[in-house]
């Protein structure tokens, strides 16, 4: 008899363009979520539709505590629970079901417990098979030279291209497994335990469902015997390159709590009713709805240009085939040597990339699709709601610059920033602060594909400056005591430091001496896995200070979200932000709207600017933060507030590598950046690993010697990080 969880949920339907009540039945043994228009219809067996859970992915909205999604069979189904607790119950039960059936899908049903030695042996064997395959691949060229028929030539070329794609996937898999093995060994020596993200020789011990499903009959509990991670009789080349995604829910963390909408009737419960008879034989090959009224994201796969094809073999197992480009080859990994070896090349060709960060680069749009199998493997090791701060991400998804340098792009329009102090009226200064703030985000995105900047090393510094458009060569007096002492007093200067590693906190400061304006901020980035998305909470605040008026504008930052991480990733901002000036009483509320799944536009913002003690705003703003924003004033005037498409981006200026200190961002990451530029992923990974190992070694040394880390340019002041020598302090000292 099937063991079942049943209860009400709301489901989004395209027909009604809204939420509709449905009665859901989760069959744990069959791996099927069926739904009915009512409980009575369920009693009569009149099923409205069903969702297959084998290979499914659960997603949550970080800003809504009641909704969740299930993505499977190239469709995304949207559900809404009564509240956060109800959603938690369903998600946990669904995760357990998905995990169970995904393990079955992978054929991991043996009691063999692998060791690191077994793993290393299979890895070496896999590398040997890979070498044989590479040698055989060369024969295609001989075939093509001897082939005279066009039709036969096309067939050989197609076969060669497909084989190339497979070889590249296997290369990525071997590299990732080697890294996992090395990190697992290092962490076992350091901590006496194995990292969650790298379970090389760990044994997954499934746990019974949490209290909500504690009443489930005993036959539904996953078998207690250890689960084999790699069947010994399988040849390495037959191992799955990209395992079907599964969110591990055996250590479930609470999902985000935020205001949700909609309703859901009484709580779900677990029963084992006799009136429901769902055997595994009744599980359809694809999820379906009788009226096909379910909402699904049609662009979930088509954006990548190569939709995954799901094949069902005679045994009922599923696999995902993806197309990948073979144009960017990797060096063959050597499994007999550690990836910690030093780079033989590196800095001699530094001029090739010294200024590349100042250019947009869309040439890598295909790299995410190319490495999709590695991303799928990585995501299969993390669980929903998991904090990703300590997760080591694959090198190829990195953007070629540090996070500290990305923060510098807040000042890509330095003329807007310094013009704040030019305004004579406090009302106009507040409007100008909002204008600069809303213009500050679009320049931070380089290229059409979202990538992740480097995690800064503790103590890392980034320095740069901007020359204002109206600056003349006569303004040559240097700001010798400023953050960038080799530039003129009319320039906007910027400095950033990674002041903490755990938690990751960056502090940055900017100023313009002649305009008597400065900016100080700190941001703690906290990332979270949301299923098909990754959310980054930017915790912290900034302060714009107009020194001539003794005004300080406190502002907060929106959260960032990486969407469609399995196809073509894109970034959106979300959350409510505020700007307040305590001296003048002016304030602004700004909302970055995330795209709703049931329609709507991307990148929308709305903002209201208020006068002191007024509840009604004198200026309303709406538009897109990376496009055009329009302002409507209480006087009836309508105008373009900011047009980021027409605003010229002023390039930041950075010292050449040979002039930088060792701990400056571009100098620290030069080997990683260079190898990413030439697409040598192995060498980039080695260089990145050396930096991380050096940081760990320094941390161990400080711990052994009981030495506290001392920051270079910033100090902690309450809950904020403040620049040691701000313009305000220097001007005050000069008066005395």
From Swiss-Prot:
Family annotation (InterPro entries): OSBP_sf, Oxysterol-bd, Oxysterol-bd_CS, PH-like_dom_sf, PH_domain
A family per Pfam: Oxysterol_BP
Biased composition (Polar residues): 314-329, 336-347
Annotated GO MF terms: sterol binding; sterol transfer activity
Tissue: Widely expressed.
Protein name: Oxysterol-binding protein-related protein 9
Record GO biological process: bile acid biosynthetic process
Family classification: Belongs to the OSBP family.
CDD domains (alphabetical): PH_ORP9
Transmembrane annotation, as ranges: none
Function description: Interacts with OSBPL11 to function as lipid transfer proteins. Together they form a heterodimer that localizes at the ER-trans-Golgi membrane contact sites, and exchanges phosphatidylserine (1,2-diacyl-sn-glycero-3-phospho-L-serine, PS) for phosphatidylinositol-4-phosphate (1,2-diacyl-sn-glycero-3-phospho-(1D-myo-inositol 4-phosphate), PI(4)P) between the two organelles, a step that is critical for sphingomyelin synthesis in the Golgi complex.
Phosphoserine modification, residue list: 306, 324-326, 329, 611
Chain positions with N-acetylalanine modification: 2
Entry-linked SUPFAM superfamilies: Oxysterol-binding protein-like, PH domain-like
Domain PH, first and last residues per copy: 2-99
Protein location: Late endosome membrane; Golgi apparatus, trans-Golgi network membrane
Biased composition (Low complexity): 253-290
Reaction(s) catalysed by this chain's protein: a 1,2-diacyl-sn-glycero-3-phospho-(1D-myo-inositol 4-phosphate)(out) + a 1,2-diacyl-sn-glycero-3-phospho-L-serine(in) = a 1,2-diacyl-sn-glycero-3-phospho-(1D-myo-inositol 4-phosphate)(in) + a 1,2-diacyl-sn-glycero-3-phospho-L-serine(out)
Region described as Disordered: 231-367
Subunit structure: Heterodimer with OSBPL11. Interacts with OSBPL10.
């Amino acid at each position: 008899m099937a063991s079942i969880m049943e209860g009400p949920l709301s489901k989004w339907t395209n027909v009604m363009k809204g939420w509709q009540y449905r009665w859901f039945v989760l069959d744990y043994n069959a791996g099927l979520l069926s739904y009915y228009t009512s409980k009575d219809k369920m009693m009569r067996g009149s099923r409205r539709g069903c969702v297959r859970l084998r290979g499914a992915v659960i997603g949550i909205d970080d800003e809504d505590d009641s909704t969740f999604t299930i993505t499977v069979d190239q469709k995304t189904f949207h559900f809404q629970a009564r509240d956060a607790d109800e959603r938690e119950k369903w998600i946990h039960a669904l995760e357990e079901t998905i995990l169970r059936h995904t393990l079955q899908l992978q054929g991991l049903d043996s009691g063999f417990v692998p060791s690191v030695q077994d793993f290393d042996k299979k890895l070496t064997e896999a590398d040997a098979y890979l070498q044989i395959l590479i040698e055989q691949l060369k024969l295609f060229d001989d075939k093509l030279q001897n082939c005279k028929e066009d039709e036969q030539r096309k067939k050989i070329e197609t076969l060669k291209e497909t084989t190339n794609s497979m070889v590249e996937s296997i290369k990525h898999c071997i590299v990732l497994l080697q890294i996992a093995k090395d990190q697992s060994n290092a962490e076992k020596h350091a901590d006496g335990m194995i990292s969650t993200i790298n379970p090389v020789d760990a044994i997954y011990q499934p746990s019974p469902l949490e209290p909500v499903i504690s009443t489930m009959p005993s036959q539904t509990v996953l078998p207690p015997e250890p689960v084999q991670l790699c069947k010994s009789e399988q040849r390495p080349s037959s191992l799955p390159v990209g395992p079907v995604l599964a969110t591990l829910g055996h250590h479930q963390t609470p999902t985000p709590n935020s205001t949700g909408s909609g309703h859901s009737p009484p709580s779900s419960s677990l029963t084992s009713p006799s009136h429901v008879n769902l055997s595994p034989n009744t599980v359809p090959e694809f999820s379906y709805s009788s009226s096909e009224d379910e909402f699904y994201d049609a662009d979930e796969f088509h954006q990548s240009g190569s939709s995954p094809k799901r094949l069902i073999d005679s045994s009922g197992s599923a696999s995902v085939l993806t197309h990948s480009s073979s144009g960017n080859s990797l060096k063959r990994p050597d499994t007999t040597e550690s990836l910690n070896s030093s780079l033989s090349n590196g800095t001699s060709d530094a001029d090739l990339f010294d200024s590349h960060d100042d250019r947009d680069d869309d040439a890598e749009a295909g790299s995410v699709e190319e490495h999709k199998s590695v991303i799928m493997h990585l995501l299969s090791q993390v669980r929903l709601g998991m904090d990703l701060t300590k997760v080591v991400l694959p090198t190829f998804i990195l953007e070629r610059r540090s996070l500290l340098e990305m923060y510098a792009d807040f000042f890509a329009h330095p003329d807007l920033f310094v013009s704040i102090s030019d305004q004579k009226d406090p009302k106009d200064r507040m409007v100008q602060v909002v204008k600069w703030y809303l213009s500050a985000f679009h320049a931070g995105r380089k290229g059409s594909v979202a990538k992740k900047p480097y995690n800064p090393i503790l103590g890392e510094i980034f320095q740069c400056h901007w020359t204002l458009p109206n600056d003349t060569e006569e303004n040559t007096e240097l700001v010798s005591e400023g953050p960038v002492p080799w530039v003129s007093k009319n320039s906007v200067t910027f400095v950033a430091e990674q002041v903490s590693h755990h938690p990751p906190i960056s502090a940055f400061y900017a100023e313009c001496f002649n305009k008597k304006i400065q900016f100080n901020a700190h941001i703690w980035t906290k990332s979270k896995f949301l299923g098909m998305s990754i959310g980054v909470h930017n915790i912290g605040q900034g302060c714009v200070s107009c020194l001539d008026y003794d005004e300080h504008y406190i502002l907060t930052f929106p959260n960032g979200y990486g969407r469609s991480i399995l196809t073509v990733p894109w970034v959106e901002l979300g959350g409510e932000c505020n700007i307040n000036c305590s001296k003048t009483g002016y304030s602004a509320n700004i909302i970055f709207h995330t795209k709703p799944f049931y329609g709507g536009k991307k990148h929308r913002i709305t903002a209201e600017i208020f006068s002191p003690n007024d509840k009604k705003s004198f200026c309303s703003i709406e538009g897109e933060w990376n496009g055009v924003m329009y302002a409507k004033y209480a006087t009836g005037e309508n105008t373009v507030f900011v047009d980021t498409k027409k605003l010229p981006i002023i390039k930041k200026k950075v010292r050449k590598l040979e002039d930088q200190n060792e701990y400056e961002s571009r100098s620290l990451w030069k080997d990683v950046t260079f190898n990413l530029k030439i697409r040598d992923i192995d060498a980039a990974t080695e260089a990145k690993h050396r930096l991380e190992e050096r940081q760990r070694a320094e941390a161990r040394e400080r711990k052994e010697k009981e030495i506290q880390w001392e920051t270079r340019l910033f100090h902690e002041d309450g809950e904020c990080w403040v620049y040691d020598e701000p313009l305000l302090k220097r001007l005050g000292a000069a008066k005395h």
